[in-house]
Amino acid sequence: MKIIIATHNPHKTEEIKNFFKGYPVEIYSMADLGIKEDIEETGDTIEENALIKARFLKEKVDGIVIADDTGLFVEHLNGQPGVYSARFAGENATYEDNNKKLLKLLEGVPYEKRKAYFKTVIAVVEREKETLLEGKLEGHILDHPRGKNGFGYDPVFYVDNLGKSLAELTMEEKNKISHRADALMKLKNYILKRLEEK
């Protein structure tokens, strides 16, 4: 079975290849197939963005196409930054810029009102079928960054049942509980089911 990932990110490709090690699945990135175009994410939701990327690539290739998008949703901010998570503080914002903006908006807000969740959506597009798979991780936003690992909003996202921020976890610990791991596990189950049908 051939799976093509709608990404230019080598880390994402590697991560998914590792997930399917030992299975009769060939995984390719856009770079592997010489597709250099950037896909504009113009959707109003992360679901729409994942589908936009997958549909764009499906028009160019055979096989199963997958694409993902992730957002951080803060209850007190009516679900912001959401679909704008990567560019919350502006078009070329750094992770630090985004975290600073988020903490500023939540200044003085008590801990119990700082509930948030990460959500990753994986769109799977086949010839006749589109499927959305979702992974979620719930927690709270801290009032200052903690930890040196990870990236993005990890230093300000507190995982209550572990008593640590995502940036205080090792990669192995994070990969066991993350929204991304949750979505990838659902993808794996989906693909294994498809393999059984063949």
Swiss-Prot record:
**InterPro entries under this entry?**
dITP/XTP_pyrophosphatase, ITPase-like_fam, RdgB/HAM1
A Gene Ontology molecular function term for this protein is: XTP diphosphatase activity
User: What catalytic reaction does the record list?
Assistant: XTP + H2O = XMP + diphosphate + H(+); dITP + H2O = dIMP + diphosphate + H(+); ITP + H2O = IMP + diphosphate + H(+)
Binding residues annotated for Mg(2+), in chain numbering: E40, D69
Q: Which residues form the active site?
A: D69 (proton acceptor)
Name the cofactor(s): Mg(2+)
Matching entries from Pfam families are given as: Ham1p_like
A GO cellular-component term linked to this record:
cytosol
The residues listed in the UniProt record as binding substrate, with positions renumbered to this chain, are: T7, H8, N9, P10, H11, K12, T70, F151, G152, Y153, D154, K174, H179, R180
Q: How is the cofactor bound?
A: Binds 1 Mg(2+) ion per subunit.
Q: What is its EC number?
A: 3.6.1.66
- Please name the GO terms of the biological process aspect recorded for this protein, alphabetically: nucleotide metabolic process; purine nucleoside triphosphate catabolic process
Query: What superkingdom heads the lineage?
Result: Bacteria
Q: What class of enzyme is it?
A: hydrolase
Q: Which UniProt keywords apply?
A: Hydrolase, Magnesium, Metal-binding, Nucleotide metabolism, Nucleotide-binding
The free-text function statement in the UniProt record for this protein reads: Pyrophosphatase that catalyzes the hydrolysis of nucleoside triphosphates to their monophosphate derivatives, with a high preference for the non-canonical purine nucleotides XTP (xanthosine triphosphate), dITP (deoxyinosine triphosphate) and ITP. Seems to function as a house-cleaning enzyme that removes non-canonical purine nucleotides from the nucleotide pool, thus preventing their incorporation into DNA/RNA and avoiding chromosomal lesions.
The annotated subunit structure for this chain is: Homodimer.
Family listed: Belongs to the HAM1 NTPase family.
* HAMAP family, A to Z: Non_canon_purine_NTPase (MF_01405)
Name the chain's protein: dITP/XTP pyrophosphatase
